[in-house]
């Protein structure tokens, strides 16, 4: 993947402004509410019966934050995201048996949460850079499935 200087700077800027403990839980909660079939991977998380229960679930919040912190590795290794996520891809494919389409659903939810957090700063150009970044992340996480 070729990254422009603007794209690199934009991705680093976005992650420098992220409130991980807000964005992570909101992203995973949104995914579990909007795409309820994704809940099947979180059976040990307890009460996921409705949007309020999901939003208040401490395990959802913790895992959402973990997911966003996991993206730090991609930010730090933008030139080698596929290898950066090789082990995580194997884990999600072979052990957890996560449908790889769910990575894209989560990326879409993150984009929405991020747009809400950044407001006017989330211009079309910023969105394009972010979505390119997330497309590479999603592809890398799904690499083991191919």
From Swiss-Prot:
Disulfide bonds: none annotated. GO terms for molecular function: haptoglobin binding; heme binding; metal ion binding; organic acid binding; oxygen binding; oxygen carrier activity; peroxidase activity. One of its GO terms (cellular component) is blood microparticle. Keywords: Heme, Iron, Metal-binding, Oxygen transport, Transport. PROSITE patterns: GLOBIN. InterPro entries: Globin (IPR000971), Globin-like_sf (IPR009050), Globin/Proto (IPR012292), Hemoglobin_b (IPR002337), Hemoglobin_oxygen_transport (IPR050056). GO terms for biological process: hydrogen peroxide catabolic process. Residues 2-146 form the Globin domain. Red blood cells. Heme b binds at residues 63, 92. Signal peptide: none annotated. It comes from the Eukaryota. Involved in oxygen transport from gills to the various peripheral tissues. Belongs to the globin family. Hb2 is a heterotetramer of two alpha chains and two beta-2 chains. This fish has two hemoglobins: Hb1 (major) and Hb2 (about 5% of the total). They display the Bohr and root effects. PANTHER family: HEMOGLOBIN FAMILY MEMBER, HEMOGLOBIN SUBUNIT EPSILON. This is Hemoglobin subunit beta-2. It comes from Cygnodraco mawsoni.
